[in-house]
Amino acid sequence: VKEKNGTWSLPGGWVDINQSIKTNTEKEVKEEAGLNVKAIRIIAIQDRNLHNIPPYAYNVCKVFVLCEIESGYFRPNIETDESAYFGLEELPILAKEKNNEEQIKMCFSAYYDRNWQVLFD
């Protein structure tokens, strides 16, 4: 999704109180990309400060989740201006505080590998 500052990121956000990782992932994709998805498996759990810049003064675990699209379509909203799909060779300018090229490549690899094993720091 295209952020308000013009950079791009995977849909995501903080897990809300009383939400599981699964339900929160599905909610965030709906809010930011307009898609109804089914979260099907965890790709990775990463320490944000080991993979993203700038570092935070506190620790955050980032959970990457593989989803299947069920329905829906994008509508501009308060968080995102646009939604699009990109191949690895055509990535736009990324919101590196949210996800970087290494993380996008990891997600592509997990999508294509039915035997993917969860990565974690």
What residue ranges belong to the model's regions?
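Hydrophobic pocket-lining residues within nucleotide cofactor-binding pockets
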Residues: 15, 69-70, 80, 91
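The catalytic Nudix box helix
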Residues: 10-44, 65
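Nudix hydrolase/Nudix homology domain
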Residues: 7-8, 78-121
